[in-house]
A protein has these predicted regions:
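Generic N-terminal amphipathic, Lys/Arg-enriched alpha-helix
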Residues: 4-19, 29-35
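Acidic/glycine-enriched connector segments
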Residues: 23, 27-30, 45-120, 128-132, ...
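A short beta-strand-loop structural module common to alpha/beta enzyme folds
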Residues: 38-45
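Acidic, glycine-centered active-site loop in nucleotide-sugar glycosyltransferases
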Residues: 137-141
């Protein structure tokens, strides 16, 4: 499969994550690698590091889109670390680079990535993350999952290029 056909999935969440969020992100990284996906993340600690670690341990490829000018603070588990110098604006690159986004917990940076992805038409699956709603929406635009396995099942339903 060429990189044009390979699904890119962003795993997003906070750098100061809970133990559950870290375990969930690591499991997601493993499952994505085993499914042949490329993991995209913000490249730093917490959920980002845990997802990259799980991906790497399963032999997968992970790309970190870093906010700073250098790679010194990048997760050591990344396959590729890209220093943007864009600060939080790098969230747009994370959202744009992915065919789908999985949000695990998270704070305001995660919320911005969710909003950007949804605005771009990219599906978002959430595990213990923000709930969004407005009076004119009949449902939360984030597809909910309780486990990493359920999140991948939703990806298979939502993303045509996502394999079996």
């Amino acid at each position: 499969m060429s990189t044009r056909d390979t699904p890119y999935v962003a795993v997003i969440g906070a750098s100061n994550a809970t133990e559950w969020e870290l375990e969930t992100a690591a499991r997601l990284g493993t499952l994505l690698a085993e499914s042949g996906c490329v993991l995209v993340c913000g490249g730093l600690g917490g959920v980002m590091d845990a997802a990259a670690r799980g991906c790497g341990e399963a032999g997968g490829i992970s790309i970190g889109i870093l906010p700073g000018d250098g790679r010194a603070l990048a997760s050591p588990h990344l396959t590729v670390a890209i220093a943007t110098g864009f600060g939080e604006a790098r969230n747009a690159i994370v959202a744009r680079s992915a065919d789908a986004v999985i949000a695990v917990g998270g704070e305001f940076g995660t919320l911005s990535e969710i909003a950007l992805a949804l605005k771009m038409g990219t599906p978002v699956v959430g595990l213990g993350t923000w709930e969004l709603g407005r009076d004119d929406l009949d449902r939360d635009p984030i597809v909910r999952a309780e486990t990493p396995e359920a999140a991948l099942a939703e990806l298979r339903r939502l993303v045509p290029t996502f394999g079996p």
